[in-house]
Amino acid sequence: MTVVDVSFEVRCERLPRDYGYALYEALAGALDWLEDEASAGVHPLHGTAAADGELFLGRRARLMLRLTEERAERSLALAGARLALGSGLEVGAGKVRALMPYATVHSHFVNTGCADEAEFLARAAAELREAGLPERMISGKAHAMSTPEGELRGFSLLLHGLSPAQSLAVQARGLGQGRKIGCGIFVPHKSVVAVGAD
C-alpha cells in the first residue's frame, strides 16, 4: 500500500487558531469515506497567528491530505468545494505528491495521550520500537488542541538518522493519536538533504 500526499490550493481570509477538529469535520462532510479511512491524515495548515486568536492563511498556504494512492485520486474531487470553516475555506486544484525519504522528519504536534514530556517520550519510543523503527528523537514545543472529547496535549517531535525505508514507513504510518486532526504527521525536516538525492 503506497501512501502519498495530496496538496490543494486554498483561499481563506481567516481561521480559528484551534481549527484542527473543525477542519476534519468539514472535510469528512465533503469526503464521505474519510471518517472510516483509518490511515488518513490531515496536515496542519500553516499561517500567521493574529493577536485576536485567529489564523491568517497566505497565498502559499496549502491543504494537505496524507492518503493511500487510491483514496488520493478520489480526494481530487474536493477541488471547488467551499468548506464551512472560519471565513469559508475555498479548495482549489489538487496535486498528488510522493513522500520523500529524508533522514530527518518532523511532526508539529504528536499526541500520545499524556502531557508529561518524559512520559510522552517513553510512549513515543515504545510505539516506534513496536513498529521496528529507531528511537532517535528530540522533543520540542508543547502544544494543546481542543476537541469535543476534551483537550489534547503533546509536543513537536523530530526523528533523525532514518534510512530511506524507515523514513517512508514513519511518514506513512504516523505516530500517536489524532492523524485526522493534524497530529502525528511527519514531514521532511527542511535543513537536511533527502536521503539518496545525490
Name each model-derived stretch.
Residues 1-198:
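RNA-interacting cores
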